[in-house]
Amino acid sequence: MNNQARTPAPSSARTSTSVRASTPTRTPTPLRTPTPVRTRTPIRTLTPVLTPSPAGTSPLVLTPAPAQIPTLVPTPALARIPRLVPPPAPAWIPTPVPTPVPVRNPTPVPTPARTLTPPVRVPAPAPAQLLAGIRAALPVLDSYLAPALPLDPPPEPAPELPLLPEEDPEPAPSLKLIPSVSSEAGPAPGPLPTRTPLAANSPGPTLDFTFRADPSAIGLADPPIPSPVPSPILGTIPSAISLQNCTETFPSSSENFALDKRVLIRVTYCGLUSYSLRYILLKKSLEQQFPNHLLFEEDRAAQATGEFEVFVNGRLVHSKKRGDGFVNESRLQKIVSVIDEEIKKR
């Protein structure tokens, strides 16, 4: 290749000589100048076109292999981060909602069981308060009942109650004696029948059931009288009215009926106060005529029914709604006659 490059140079020199032969005659010689056409041989230098082998560098275009960097586009694998959305698993935090288990704290509510123990003791003084209210009401009732009641029957000796060897001659502490505040109390009873030797030898002071009528002396007993008094029957707590009648009249032992032999008097009356006073009047009158023979049972209506019914051993003997009206002297005699018949049957 270098040799060929050198050959054209002399030819060009020669051409220059021909140019110097500027004589017009020799000008046809320039026709030989086509020899320079041979200089086209350098066209062979087109072989350098092979130099586009640098174009072979176009394989370097493969260098866009860096364009393969978009292969990093798979980095949208970060788009998988939405899979991290499962972190809402912290939504399990509501599971601590069962922490309301502290609501079991109400279990201490059974502690009111301690409050149940005081009520058990409270009912003990309740009867004393109730009896105190009855005692306060008795003077008014006695003043109201005194004009309408007949004279008290003469007092009779108290019954003789033999005491068993196992019994305690002293009254039970749970039984309370209710004093009588009525101004109608009769004179002190006469001598009572003697008791059995065991009861006669029992030490201790005797109790008197008679009390003064002075309201200021309510709850205070008179000085004891040295006379034997029968002990109360255990298991029975009579009402205030019945105890008052017992203090006023002492029935004989023959009239002391057992509870199963007593005549049941059931009175159903209206809830008004006037009806309850009429019931007390009737009860006191019958107890004075039949001491220790009657067992009273009252049924007071909660409303004002205007009813006043008297049953003797389940038999209706008086009814206000049926036209009998209130119990007057004639109606009272009818009830007394029915009770006499029942006592004779027993």
Curated annotation (Swiss-Prot):
Domain of life from the UniProt record: Eukaryota
Gene3D superfamilies from the UniProt entry: Glutaredoxin
NCBIfam families for the chain: CXXU_selWTH (TIGR02174)
Residue spans of biased composition, Pro residues class: 151-162
Pfam family, one: Rdx
Keyword Phosphoprotein: no
InterPro entries: Selenoprotein_Rdx-typ (IPR011893), SelW_related (IPR051441), Thioredoxin-like_sf (IPR036249)
Family: Belongs to the SelWTH family.
Renumbered residue ranges of the record's region Disordered: 1-40, 151-206
Keywords: Redox-active center, Selenocysteine, Ubl conjugation
Full protein name: Selenoprotein V
GO biological process terms on file: response to selenium ion
Post-translational modification note: Truncated SELENOV proteins produced by failed UGA/Sec decoding are ubiquitinated by the CRL2(APPBP2) complex, which recognizes the glycine (Gly) at the C-terminus of truncated SELENOV proteins.
Gene Ontology cellular-component terms listed: cytosol
Keyword hit for Ubl conjugation: yes
Functional note: May be involved in a redox-related process.
Covalent cross-link Cysteinyl-selenocysteine (Cys-Sec), where: 270-273
Tissue specificity as recorded in UniProt: Testis specific.
